[in-house]
From Swiss-Prot:
The gene is rhlB. Residues 245-390 form the Helicase C-terminal domain. Transmembrane segments: none annotated. It catalyses: ATP + H2O = ADP + phosphate + H(+). This is ATP-dependent RNA helicase RhlB. DEAD-box RNA helicase involved in RNA degradation. Has RNA-dependent ATPase activity and unwinds double-stranded RNA.
Length: 421
């Protein structure tokens, strides 16, 4: 992490459990991010927290550190049974649950606390086998958690810590009834430590905190600035006919190390993937109907650098921690203003700089005024020369082979295509 992203507050300044501090130091975490510096004094004192921070500011480590410290510092509930986890971390998507689990593994190995993972799509029996042996911290999505609870594979009567991550996304995906169902099966709010984290603390999220938490403290980091100041924003106005060629020209011109391209529909994402894969780019496709194993493989390949470009719907816009994304392209302007913030928040993370390029086409340009009102500023407009757009483009591929794309590793320099000033 960049030093500009950190505070003077050190993890060692807090009365954290020694094993937790040891893991943090081994992982290179010495100074707190702003959200961690605000949250830890409260959670270590047993206070509930509802936190808002821009994506990529350390929310996950804030609640994991608090959770492990609390469980190590407090005994389990008397007569706790093997199917009763001590902590529950709820996430809106399978990918986010998997990432939280991965981030928690070093802490679990050092402390002896057992982790469990529960998400839909696949792995039912494998996940259940782990749960049957007993877990201390259960991380999962609401649907699979309810499934296990209804079959008595898990019982939430001994929960001591609850974390709700990306709470606003839970509402967007219609999971709020599931969340309330799970909360009703836990001990009362004043008998557990409750943490809620979200990129936005809307009225409905605050209402949930009031319902399910014990007089939570609200903490916010840079709430007045909805888009990161390290993200360069840029806007083009292409015609529908020139839109794809403009995207491909910009990719050749920018030559991003790691880019995510967002579109509003599955069909549009597949179309973009086909054009880029045909042009030799190492590109992956992430939409809602991609099988879970393939989704995780694509994300892993993108994170490792085996893929340079990921084309995605908003299923990937929130919660995913993909480091070192240099560029975000909004091929379609989103219909939801908040999705614009979450999309471009994939870049410029953890103190790094990033570049967001949006295409306001004839179909989605009407979304722009609401987006600019929401973010509080106009997006700088750039012009392009239609005569300079790429024309020597191969016929797009269709999805008749693996979606991760088999384009060759990019070598050499990009083609010399320049846009007008």
């Amino acid at each position: 992490m960049s030093k500009t992203h950190l505070t003077e507050q050190k993890f060692s300044d807090f009365a954290l459990h020694p094993k937790v501090v040891e893991v943090l130091e081994k992982k290179g975490f010495h100074n707190c991010t702003p959200i961690q510096a605000l949250a830890l004094p409260l959670t270590l004192a047993g206070r509930d927290v509802a936190g808002q921070a821009q994506t990529g500011t350390g929310k996950t480590m804030a609640f994991l550190t608090s959770t492990f410290h609390y469980l190590l510092s407090h005994p389990a509930i008397a007569d706790r049974k093997v199917n009763q986890p001590r902590a529950l971390i709820m996430a809106p998507t399978r990918e986010l649950a998997v990432q939280i689990h991965a981030d928690a593994e070093p802490l679990a190995e050092a402390t002896g606390l057992k982790l469990g993972l529960a998400y839909g799509g696949d792995g039912y029996d494998k996940q259940l086998k782990v749960l049957e042996s007993g877990v201390d911290i259960l991380i999962g999505t609401t649907g699979r958690l309810i499934d296990y609870a209804k079959q008595n594979h898990i019982n939430l009567g001994a929960i001591q810590v609850v974390v709700l991550d990306e709470a606003d996304r839970m509402y967007d995906l219609g999971f709020i009834k599931d969340i309330r169902w799970l909360f009703r099966r836990m001990p009362p709010a004043n008998q557990r430590l409750n943490m809620l984290f979200s990129a936005t603390l809307s009225y409905r999220v605050r209402e949930l905190a009031f319902e399910q938490m014990n007089n939570a403290e609200y903490i916010e980091v840079e709430p007045e600035q909805k888009t990161g100041h390290r993200i360069k924003e840029e806007l083009f106005y292409p015609s529908n006919e020139e839109k794809m060629r403009l995207l491909q020209t910009l990719i050749e011109e920018e030559w991003p190390d790691r880019a995510i391209i967002f579109a509003n529909t599955k069909h549009r994402c597949e179309e973009i993937w086909g054009h880029l894969a045909a042009d030799g780019h190492r590109v992956g496709l992430l939409t809602g109907d991609v099988a879970q194993k393939k989704r995780l493989r694509i994300l892993d390949e993108f994170t490792r650098g085996d893929l340079d470009i990921l084309v995605a719907t908003d299923v990937a816009a929130r919660g995913l921690h993909i480091p070192a994304v240099t560029h975000v392209f909004n091929y379609d302007l989103p219909d939801d203003c908040e999705d614009y913030v979450h999309r471009i928040g994939r870049t410029g993370r953890a103190g790094a700089s990033g570049h967001s390029i949006s295409l306001a086409c004839e179909e989605y340009a009407l979304n722009l005024p609401a987006i600019e009102t929401y973010i509080g500023h106009s997006i700088p407009v750039s012009k392009y020369n239609p005569d300079a757009l790429m024309t020597d483009l191969p016929k797009p591929l269709r999805l008749t082979r693996p979606r991760t794309g088999n384009g060759p590793r990019r070598t050499g320099a990009p083609r010399n295509r320049r846009r007008s000033g």
